[in-house]
C-alpha cells in the first residue's frame, strides 16, 4: 500500500450481555458519537440477538491508531450509548482496508480483489465487486477467450471517490455532517 493512502481500519468486539440489552431488529450504522480527533470515526452496533452484538470502531485516516484507541471507543460506546457496564467479549476482529486504486503486483497476471481494483475507494466495500470480477473472468473462460478481469468501477465513480477521500483527508471534521 503506497504511503499516504487513506485507510479504513477497525476493531470489532462480539459482546454478550444481559437479556434485553440489544434490539435485534435495529442495526446502528455509522454512529458518529465518538472521538473524531484522528479522522472520520464511527461505531457500528449490529445485534445478533437481545444479548449479543458486534460493536465495531471504524476509522478513516492515512495512519493507524493504537489498539487502545479502538478499545476505548468501544468501551465508551457500550457504557455511554448502550448504558452497559457489564459484558463479556466473546470474539475480537480487526482489519485494515486501503482506500485507493492499488497497482497490480504482476501486470502479466489478472488480479482479483484488491489487486484487481475491486475495493471501492470511498467505502472499502469489495465483496460484490469481487463477485462481478469473477463472473467476468468465468464468462471469458467459458467462451474460450483469454482470462481477463475487469475493473468494476467506472472512471467517474473513481473520480468522485478521489474527491471524497481528499475532503476526508483535509477536513475530517466535516464527515459527521
Q: Which residues does each predicted region cover?
A:
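An active-site-proximal "capping" alpha-helix that borders the catalytic cofactor pocket
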Residues: 72-79, 126-145
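C-terminal helical "tail/cap" subdomain of flavin- and related membrane-associated enzymes
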Residues: 135-177
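Short FAD-binding loop at a beta-strand-to-alpha-helix junction that anchors the flavin cofactor
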Residues: 45, 50-52, 106-122
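FAD-binding beta-loop-beta segment adjacent to the flavin cofactor pocket
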Residues: 35-40, 94-112, 121, 164-175
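Predominantly flavin-linked oxidoreductase catalytic cores and closely associated redox partners
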Residues: 1-88, 97-105
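AAA+ P-loop NTPase domains with strong preference for DNA replication initiators
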Residues: 108, 127, 131, 149-154
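Aromatic-anchored, charged helix-turn/loop surface patch used as a conserved interaction hotspot
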Residues: 7, 121-125
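Short catalytic/ligand-gating loop segments at beta-alpha or beta-beta junctions
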Residues: 90-94, 154
Amino acid at each position: 500500500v503506497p504511503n499516504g493512502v487513506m485507510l479504513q481500519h477497525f476493531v470489532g468486539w462480539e459482546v454478550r450481555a444481559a437479556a434485553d440489552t440489544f434490539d435485534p431488529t435495529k442495526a446502528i450504522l455509522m454512529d458518529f458519537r465518538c472521538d473524531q480527533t484522528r479522522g472520520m470515526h464511527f461505531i457500528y452496533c449490529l445485534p445478533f440477538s437481545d444479548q449479543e452484538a458486534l460493536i465495531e470502531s471504524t476509522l478513516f485516516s492515512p495512519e493507524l491508531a493504537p489498539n487502545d484507541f479502538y478499545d476505548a471507543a468501544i468501551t465508551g460506546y457500550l457504557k455511554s450509548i448502550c448504558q452497559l457496564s457489564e459484558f463479556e467479549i466473546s470474539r475480537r476482529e480487526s482489519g485494515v482496508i486501503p482506500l485507493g486504486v492499488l497497482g497490480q503486483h504482476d501486470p502479466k497476471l489478472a488480479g482479483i480483489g484488491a489487486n484487481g481494483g475491486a475495493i471501492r475507494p470511498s467505502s472499502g466495500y469489495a465483496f460484490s465487486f469481487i463477485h462481478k470480477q469473477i463472473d467476468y473472468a468465468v464468462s471469458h473462460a467459458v467462451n474460450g477467450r483469454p482470462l481477463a478481469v475487469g475493473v468494476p468501477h467506472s472512471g467517474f465513480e473513481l473520480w468522485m471517490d478521489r474527491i471524497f477521500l481528499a475532503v476526508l483527508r483535509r477536513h475530517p471534521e466535516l464527515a459527521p455532517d
